[in-house]
Amino acid sequence: GLSRSDRVALRARERALTLSGFRLLDSHLYLRPDNLVGHAAAARDRLYKLGLDSNAPVFSVRDLDPERERLARTLWQGDKLNASYRQGRIKLQAWIEHADQLDLDVAARESFLLGNDAIRQLVYDPLLSEPLVDVRERRAFTDVVRHYDQVGRDIWRRQLAQLSQQPAMPVALTP
């Protein structure tokens, strides 16, 4: 098996590539669409900051052969991403609509859990462009997450204010 340091480096590489939307095309070639501001240079900087070995080459690829081009287009499941944007948006909107009916402690707990899921989805989103994903649906999801964040912050401000007003419970210390 791999040594401990090799496993740590492998995990760092996989995490950096995944967080940046790269997918494995063949044995040693990871790629992503070149649709981000800054192109390969910005991707390289981000990957290195996220833990990719600084000796790993990061470059732009053009003119893949037809078979690799076909395979490359199958690496991201755009339909699944679109569905996750839509489902996430609907779930958060529904929660926002009834959040004021929840007890404050329940609302705080749920806002934390749902918010965690939404943030994770945003962090791991590969930020693909049309036609791979529905960019409007992703934008709608992101807009709802921003609104949800404001609602959640308000809930947590009230929750923390309420907690700070409660007297501390005495604790009996036994020797």
Report each predicted region and the residues it spans.
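Short, hydrophobic/proline-enriched secondary-structure or compact coil segments at domain edges
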Residues: G1-L2, I119
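C-terminal regulatory/effector modules of DNA-binding transcriptional regulators
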Residues: P66-P175
